[in-house]
């Protein structure tokens, strides 16, 4: 299985266009040793030719331009994208679909709850129906596994995550299973397994068991501290309120990942306020000391 990190930042990217927190300001004035990042999205393939896009970032055009296999140039109009999987209906995971309209129709896999959001509060399915068939919906059931024909050697097992629907959603304050998903992706030839959960607010025994069975854990790296947004003066909500488990402290993501010495561990969906973006920070050193990697745009993983 080929895993390509197209974007590794949380919503807004890094540096965020309107932010002057220590990280964003430091990156712009050159006082911070850090790497710019686009908003999170990954691509998966079983042959390096046919790719499944997981979430469609607002930065999708730049991400595809930076990854040559996404333009195989076999025809006058071409793309390496053969299917799209949406883990939720958040704006920073779906807006990129608008930029892919010239390539419609697209096969899109998502839950019923995500499809409801994308036909009501943010009606992308309706809007894009005017472009050559638009988005062709394939239902993700919450029980069992599924295979996408373009990559027949990859088996996807979805699992619901506890998190809120987007602010625009008609059921924002009435959460349902299927609003947010993680994925366990297995290459049935090699046996390699990826646990992918860019929005992970709580880890229960069922998830721990799935993580133990995986070879690579690509998980939520949004915040270092639960009250980071408040400390930095850029927000009022905690990480847990937003559905993100912070890295630091008792019960934090790093403590969870300490229990997986065999697995490759990678943090993704990193917010612009997170001090691990500063490559010289003690927080970054602590992450590395504990055997955890920080995802970056263009990172490649094979399982």
Swiss-Prot record:
Report whether Coiled coil shows up as a keyword of the record. Answer: no
Recorded hits in InterPro entries, A to Z, give: Metallo-B-lactamas (IPR001279), PQQ_synth_PqqB (IPR011842), RibonucZ/Hydroxyglut_hydro (IPR036866)
Give the metabolic or biological pathway.
Cofactor biosynthesis; pyrroloquinoline quinone biosynthesis
Which superkingdom heads the taxonomic lineage of this protein's source?
Bacteria
Which controlled-vocabulary keywords does the entry list?
PQQ biosynthesis, Transport
A biological process from GO: pyrroloquinoline quinone biosynthetic process
Functionally, this protein is described as follows: May be involved in the transport of PQQ or its precursor to the periplasm.
By sequence similarity, the record places it as follows: Belongs to the PqqB family.
Q: Sorted alphabetically, which HAMAP family does this protein's record hold?
A: PQQ_syn_PqqB
Q: What is this protein called?
A: Coenzyme PQQ synthesis protein B
Q: What is the lineage of its organism?
A: Bacteria, Pseudomonadati, Pseudomonadota, Gammaproteobacteria, Pseudomonadales
In the UniProt record, the gene name given for this protein reads pqqB
């Amino acid at each position: 299985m080929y895993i390509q990190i197209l974007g590794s930042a949380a919503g807004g990217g890094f540096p965020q266009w309107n932010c002057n927190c220590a990280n964003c300001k430091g990156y712009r004035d050159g006082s911070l040793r850090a790497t710019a990042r686009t908003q999170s999205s990954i691509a998966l393939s079983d042959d390096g030719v046919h790719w499944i896009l997981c979430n469609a970032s607002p930065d999708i055009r730049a991400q595809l331009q930076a990854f040559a296999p996404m333009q195989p140039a076999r025809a006058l109009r071409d793309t390496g994208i053969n299917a799209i999987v949406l883990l939720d209906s958040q704006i920073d995971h779906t807006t990129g679909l608008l930029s892919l309209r010239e390539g419609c129709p697209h096969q899109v896999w998502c839950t019923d709850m995500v499809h409801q959001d994308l036909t009501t509060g943010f009606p992308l399915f309706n809007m894009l129906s005017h472009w050559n068939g638009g988005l062709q919906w394939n239902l993700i059931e919450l029980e069992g596994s599924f295979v996408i024909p373009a990559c027949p050697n990859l088996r996807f097992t979805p699992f619901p995550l506890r998190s809120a629907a987007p602010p625009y959603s008609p059921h924002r304050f009435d959460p349902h299973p299927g609003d947010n998903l993680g994925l366990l992706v297995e290459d049935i030839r090699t046996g390699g397994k990826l646990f992918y959960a860019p929005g992970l607010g709580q880890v229960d025994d069922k998830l721990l068991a799935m993580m133990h069975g995986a070879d690579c854990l690509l998980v939520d790296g949004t915040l270092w501290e639960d009250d980071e947004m408040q400390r930095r003066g850029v927000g009022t909500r905690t990480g847990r309120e937003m559905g993100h488990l912070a890295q630091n402290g008792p019960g934090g993501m790093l403590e969870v990942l300490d229990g997986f010495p065999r697995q490759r561990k990678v943090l993704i969906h990193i917010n612009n306020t997170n001090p691990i973006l500063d490559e010289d920070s003690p927080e970054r050193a602590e992450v590395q000391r504990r055997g955890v990697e920080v995802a970056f745009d263009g990172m490649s993983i094979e399982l």
